[in-house]
Amino acid sequence: MKIAIVNDMPLAVEALRRAVALEPAHQVVWVASNGAEAVQRCTEQLPDLILMDLIMPVMDGVEATRRIMAETPCAIVIVTVDRKQNVHRVFEAMGHGALDVVDTPALGAGDAREAAAPLLRKILNIGWLVGQQRAPAARSVAAPLREASQRRGLVAIGSSAGGPAALEVLLKGLPAAFPAAIVLVQHVDQVFAAGMAEWLSSAAGLPVRLAREGEPPQPGQVLLAGTNHHIRLLQNGQLAYTAEPVNEIYRPSIDVFFESVARYWNGDAVGVLLTGMGRDGAQGLKLMRQQGFLTIAQDQASSAVYGMPKAAAAIDAAVEIRPLERIAGRLTEFFAK
């Protein structure tokens, strides 16, 4: 994989160089010391992956991510030395299309491979996502769409790259007294999950908190999957975290949650698949449609990364394909019936 480093700190650059060099399949193709330089370098030599710092002179990592994803899109991972202090910037960058976030590996650590392991795992996962070329599954006839009733309601939302900003827009568009439960599955490391819930609560104006083991989704609640395990709905209506299936690249998996909703939810439900790279959520959304639930995929024009919604559209998993700004209104209309 061809990797670029964008960082103004020489020690951080050297630490990242050494970490990347631990895997012979990876090579550093260029280094930029600020975001403006990175934007220019991407027009000259587009890498497979950029390791992007947040705090830099001239142009910071948030604006650089926005510019690169708009002009020469490629995979971006945010690399930071202070996650707590930079949590809001992290979600801004992810809102513009950054895929993930990881700590800067320590230079001179006793076991270099162990220190670099979190970064190398992220690179491996993103390499798999960028390179995957699965053929779309065969289409099947969906069950007739269920009309909303007076039964309890659930909105299951999956998102990845570009998700934080998309979730902010969607949640902002919902009324304060929205009657259904909402469960969010965003590809984010558990270290950042609590910060994301806090950020969404502040930015979107609806209280968002982490989903707890064993609790049922309740009307009016907005719950965010909060660990590196998958979240699923059990037959008794409670939420549970599980390590299985272990072979899922992203944790939490959107497919795992959507599939459990299709299998066990006995009220009204809507599945929503937002911006993101890869195919996670497409098959689960299709299962929800086959059970007669309303399913919605974000359209290409409003997606920061048109991967997951595109995969859903390709297998006819979405009953409706909508611009982001029109999804909240559709949910409100559906549950008002």
UniProtKB/Swiss-Prot annotation:
GO terms for biological process: chemotaxis. The active site is at residues 160, 187, 280. One of its GO terms (molecular function) is protein-glutamine glutaminase activity. It catalyses: [protein]-L-glutamate 5-O-methyl ester + H2O = L-glutamyl-[protein] + methanol + H(+); L-glutaminyl-[protein] + H2O = L-glutamyl-[protein] + NH4(+). NCBIfam families: PRK00742.1, PRK12555.1. Belongs to the CheB family. This is Protein-glutamate methylesterase/protein-glutamine glutaminase of group 3 operon. It comes from Pseudomonas putida (strain ATCC 47054 / DSM 6125 / CFBP 8728 / NCIMB 11950 / KT2440). The gene is cheB3.
